[in-house]
Amino acid sequence: MIQVAMKLSQQLRLGEHRCDVIIAITHCRLPNDVKIANALGAVANTDPSKNGVDLILGGHDHEYYIGRGIESYEGSDFDTEMPGSENDENSFIIKSGTDFHDLSAVEITLSEPHPPTAVRRRTIEHVKGMYNVLTRF
């Protein structure tokens, strides 16, 4: 998955689309999302000279997880020490619950444009989120 994401990142950033930001939507277990985030630079203070993704919106686990790189998260307290998160290197990961019972609103702040030699024209400086409950049983 990492190799495919890297290839797509190169196409999206350097090809005809010239994307400033890439948001990956995954359906992985938390340890895999953490591994992907670390490998592809979906972390705070990422290197703008490297390809990769900027933010991961994850599913599959049916649990809420907020990566350690997320600056603030309103609406509830979440444990960033969940099993499978041990290797989280300040990731920009949001795993937003289960079966559309919960919803995350996400606000990202981008850097000023990087020099033309950078692969990532902009990087994420801050991520803020808000937890919303849609339904309760």
Model-derived regions: residue spans:
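Short acidic, glycine-rich surface-loop motifs adjacent to enzyme active sites
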Residues: A5-D33
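Active-site-adjacent helix-turn-beta-strand microarchitecture at beta-sheet edges
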Residues: V34-F137
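Cap/lid and interdomain-hinge subdomains that line or gate substrate/regulatory clefts
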Residues: M1-M6, E125
